[in-house]
């Protein structure tokens, strides 16, 4: 991870497309934040792919493995079983393995969302639906309740 850049300040939405081989251009700004190698995995709370720095992934693995196996076995299978370490090629593309593409419904148009220290990769149609006017109204209500 680039020490001069603050991962917590990383924000933004970036559009990309998948090629026929399942590769996508990973935005330079996001690549700089995560470094030359990072982990991509399913996300528990949404049908998208989560991007982890190697440091954050190691912390997550350590935390989960410190908890009772009886309580975390399903979580370990879900997250660890779907995780892939990836590195951008010379053109800045990363391969999204078929199981992750299928899980997130990625076909062509995608959105990379940088969320203050983490990133998610979404199918564009799912991302647009998530950000519909109805959902935005619910978010505004929740934000006000939380004092944001």
Where is each model-derived feature located?
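Flexible "stalk/tail and boundary" regions
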Residues: 1-16, 20-21, 29-86, 90-91, ...
């Amino acid at each position: 991870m680039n020490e001069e850049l603050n991962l917590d300040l990383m924000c933004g939405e970036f559009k990309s497309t998948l090629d026929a081989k399942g590769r996508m251009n990973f935005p330079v700004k996001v690549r700089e934040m995560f470094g030359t190698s990072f982990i991509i995995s399913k996300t528990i709370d949404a049908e998208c792919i989560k991007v982890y720095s190697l440091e954050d992934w190691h912390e997550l693995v350590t935390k989960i493995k410190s908890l009772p196996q009886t309580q975390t076995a399903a979580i370990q299978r879900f997250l660890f079983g779907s995780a892939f370490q990836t590195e951008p090629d010379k053109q800045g593309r990363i391969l999204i393995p078929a199981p992750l593409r299928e899980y997130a419904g990625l076909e062509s148009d995608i959105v990379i969302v940088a969320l203050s220290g983490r990133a998610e990769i979404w199918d564009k149609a799912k991302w647009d639906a998530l950000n519909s006017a109805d959902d935005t109204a619910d978010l505004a209500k929740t934000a006000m309740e939380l004092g944001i």
